[in-house]
Regions:
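Short, aromatic/basic-enriched loop-to-helix "N-cap" motif that marks the start
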Residues: 3, 85-86
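Non-catalytic, well-ordered alpha-helical scaffold segments
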Residues: 36, 40, 60-64, 94
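Short amphipathic alpha helix immediately N-terminal
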Residues: 54-74
Length: 117
């Protein structure tokens, strides 16, 4: 994975961390256009992570642990039954953050790649 610039990573993490409040605003009918877009981006990015885990049940459990680790700022060591090693866990987390940043058009375009990759 390509390392994200600190500012891009911080903004993408903030988008993920705000997702629980965003869900409440959507549920209460008080959501902005950004709320709707960001909630969809976070959901799609999360579902796209951990693609190398074959079991759908295990993949969803891992995705939930990654999501909670970012939303509640919990390190790997505080997550019970992480289902993988520390390094793999943080690679999945980085993948999730990068997918959010990419979907929000926060990443610089790479030479030789089309927009949106």
């Amino acid at each position: 994975l390509v390392k994200l610039d600190a500012d891009i990573k911080a903004i993408a993490r903030s988008i993920i961390q705000g997702n629980e409040k965003r869900k409440k605003r959507i549920k209460n009918g008080q959501a902005s256009a950004f709320d709707l877009q960001a909630a969809q981006v976070v959901g799609n990015a999360l579902r796209g992570t951990c693609g190398n885990i074959e079991s759908v049940r295990v993949r969803r459990q891992m995705q939930e642990k990654i999501y909670k680790s970012i939303v509640y700022n919990m390190p790997y060591e505080y997550i019970a039954d992480a289902l993988c090693g520390r390094r793999q866990f943080y690679e999945y987390r980085q993948e999730f953050i990068k997918r959010v940043a990419s979907a929000m058009d926060m990443l610089p375009e790479q030479k030789g790649q089309e927009h949106g990759n």
